[in-house]
Amino acid sequence: MQLADKTALVTGGSDGIGLSIARELKAAGTSVIVVGRNAGRLASAQAEGFEALEADLSAEAGCTALLQALGTRTIDIVINNAGMGSDFDVNAPVDLAATDRCIFLNLNAPIRLIVGLLDALKARPTAMIVNVTSGLAIAPNAGSPVYCATKAGLRSFTLALRAQLKGTSIHVLEALPPVVETRMTADNNHRKLPAAECARQVVAAMAAGRDEANVGMTRLL
């Protein structure tokens, strides 16, 4: 896909993988709207030249507010990157409210945004949906069962979505990062891929029109 002169929406775009993807796209000539929920990080993104929208996508109200804020804006690329982890051990007290937020942000929000923006994307000569899943969608970790389940669910949704949109102007890409150096993985002692390198590989896959971006070590899965 030609990335220059396109407009991309990047959720979770004020930090980590999302911000790094936004920077790569900007360098390729794409106008980028970053979405996040931290006002300070959004202000920093604005200082880099990005348009910023504040929305908490871990609840239905935040998804609705974002779609309303976008209105009839022209969007060529939607990158569903926002995500969160969830501590979950059935042998210990479980915070079900936090579990629900994780499921909504990681799985429900991408589906809602895709449904809300689908007609606008179909109207574009070329468009793209990028769903950021994880290597854990293929090889789950017993310590993060809810997170792994949401990413596996998004992977399955992405595969079906690609089949349903065959023959339209919309290309569907799944990005599967390994453990990446972000705030979310600060306590993870595994070897981490720099967010900038992850973003470089994802954007290269977008430009090449690939169906999957198996980033870093996920190529081995």
Q: What is the predicted function of each stretch?
A:
Residues 7, 14-15:
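Conserved glycine-rich cofactor-binding loop
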Residues 167, 174, 182, 186-221:
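C-terminal helical subdomain
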Residues 134:
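Residue(s) in the substrate-gating loop at a strand-loop-helix junction
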Residues 64, 68, 85-100, 143:
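Conserved mid-core segment of classical short-chain dehydrogenase/reductases
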Residues 141-145, 188:
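Active-site loop immediately N-terminal to the catalytic Tyr-X3-Lys motif
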Residues 114, 150:
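Active-site helix of classical SDR
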Residues 47-61:
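Rossmann-fold cofactor-recognition segment
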